[in-house]
């Protein structure tokens, strides 16, 4: 692990899009401990790829903490969309496998969002805690059985028909715990 951290220091940027919460927490913790790793862009999609997120966190900002926006188990606290239980995943007939019905076209919006933030970071046009949100089309969300999340609307406003990018700053939470424990250590 020590050699991996040393190798990270030679990078200009880390883009974390694995969807593995434990990996994201490790990267967040390494950065908060001022280990010299570069800025990190975390990216993820919501169910059915109907919304996407990209956040830039940099150790130059002591309040930059990915965990502030997630539960301890990695559930995002402010999704754009909401879904009835079970509507996010479908089961294949005659098989135990489950899947979310989206593909490359649906993901393209989120990939572009993450790519744009990555390029802006590398050329110096982004700052720590930049947070970009792709809000998919309302008709697609409704077609798949979802809706806009009222809590998200109360913070960011009604996206109406969707199909837009929102640029804001990443949240900080005094109740985050994990971030504040590493600062006290």
What are these model-predicted stretches?
Residues 1-3:
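S-adenosyl-L-methionine
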Residues 6-13, 18-185:
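Glycine-rich phosphate/adenylate-binding loop
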């Amino acid at each position: 692990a020590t050699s991996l951290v040393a190798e990270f220091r030679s990078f200009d940027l880390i883009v974390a899009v694995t969807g593995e919460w434990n990996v994201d927490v490790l990267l967040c913790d390494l950065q908060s401990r001022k280990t010299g790793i570069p800025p990190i862009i975390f990216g993820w999609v919501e169910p059915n790829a109907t919304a996407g997120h990209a956040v830039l966190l940099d150790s130059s900002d002591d309040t930059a903490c990915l965990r502030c926006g997630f539960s301890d188990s990695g559930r995002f606290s402010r999704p754009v969309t909401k879904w009835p239980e079970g509507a996010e995943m479908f089961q294949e007939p005659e098989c135990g496998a489950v899947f979310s019905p989206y593909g490359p076209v649906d993901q393209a919006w989120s990939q572009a969002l993450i790519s744009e933030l990555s390029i802006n970071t590398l050329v110096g046009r982004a700052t720590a805690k930049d947070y970009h949100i792709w809000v998919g089309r309302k008709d697609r969300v409704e077609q798949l059985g979802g809706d806009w999340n009222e809590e998200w609307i109360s913070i960011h406003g009604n996206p109406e028909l969707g199909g837009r990018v929102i640029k804001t700053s990443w949240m900080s939470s005094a109740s985050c715990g994990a971030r504040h424990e590493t600062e006290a250590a």
